């Protein structure tokens, strides 16, 4: 029970301080703020007349202007160029990889052939097996 009295007294002091000072008015929004939005809200929302004419300016079936057609064509061409460059780069990477693999395979084959020749060498040049004279 001893802690309830100081807690109650503290709550009353805080409540009286809030009601006496004008700083509490800033937490409440005024009607004029809603009428005149400022900052980010002004960028998001537009007047009703502009919003109505926004969709009237160009409907879905309206013909595109030449500038719009040219801009879309430039975007398409740029995308095609990026795609072409990407595929060319991938093809070059694969060709380099395949060439290195073939070179390594050729090297392994050459080494194995040399080892086989050294193992089967009989002292004759060319080797006796390949230089037989038929009688």
From Swiss-Prot:
Which residues are propeptide?
28-61
Location(s) in or outside the cell = Secreted, Extracellular space, Extracellular matrix
**Coiled-coil blocks:** 64-114
Q: Which domain of life is it from?
A: Eukaryota
One Pfam annotation reads UCMA
| Broad class of where this protein is predominantly found | secreted
Q: Does the keyword Signal apply?
A: yes
Q: What biological-process terms (Gene Ontology) are attached?
A: embryonic skeletal system development; regulation of osteoblast differentiation
Q: What does this protein do?
A: May be involved in the negative control of osteogenic differentiation of osteochondrogenic precursor cells in peripheral zones of fetal cartilage and at the cartilage-bone interface.
Q: Return the protein name.
A: Unique cartilage matrix-associated protein
Organism whose genome encodes this protein: Danio rerio
């Amino acid at each position: 029970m001893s802690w309830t009295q100081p807690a109650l007294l503290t709550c009353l002091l805080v409540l009286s301080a809030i009601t006496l000072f004008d700083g509490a008015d800033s937490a409440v929004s005024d009607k004029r703020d809603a009428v005149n939005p400022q900052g980010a809200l002004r960028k998001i929302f537009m007047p009703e007349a502009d919003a109505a004419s926004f969709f009237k300016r160009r409907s879905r079936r309206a013909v595109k202007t030449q500038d719009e057609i040219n801009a879309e064509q430039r975007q398409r061409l740029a995308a095609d160029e990026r795609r072409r460059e990407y595929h060319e780069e991938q093809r070059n990477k694969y060709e380099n990889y395949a060439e290195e693999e073939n070179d390594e395979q050729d090297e392994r084959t050459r080494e194995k052939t040399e080892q086989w020749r050294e193992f089967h060498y009989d002292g004759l040049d060319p080797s006796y097996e390949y230089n037989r004279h038929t009688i």
